[in-house]
Amino acid sequence: MAHDRVGNRLKELRSKAGMTQARLAELVGVSRISILAIENGRFLPTIETALLIAQTLDVPVERIFWLKEENS
């Protein structure tokens, strides 16, 4: 499922940045539960939140939220 791929990429990039879910949530302006839900594939963020997450992690938004399979 696309949500799972997004969640896995977000978790990986957040971890590489040395950031906790709580810290990312604080910097983006959402709850830690929201970050947890995105990482667990329960939902996708709004466009505004997606852009803020990407900006906070210093990566292009499509690196996290590209829904197409990488090897397709």
Predicted regions and their residues:
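Residues in the helix-turn-helix
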Residues: 23, 34, 63
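A detector for short, charged/polar N-terminal pre-domain segments
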Residues: 1-5, 69-72
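DNA major-groove recognition helix of helix-turn-helix/homeodomain DNA-binding modules
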Residues: 48-63
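Short amphipathic helical patch at the helix-1/turn junction of helix-turn-helix
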Residues: 4, 15-16, 44
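Short, charged recognition helix plus adjacent turn
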Residues: 55, 65-72
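Short basic helix-loop element that most often maps to the first helix and adjoining turn
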Residues: 8-27
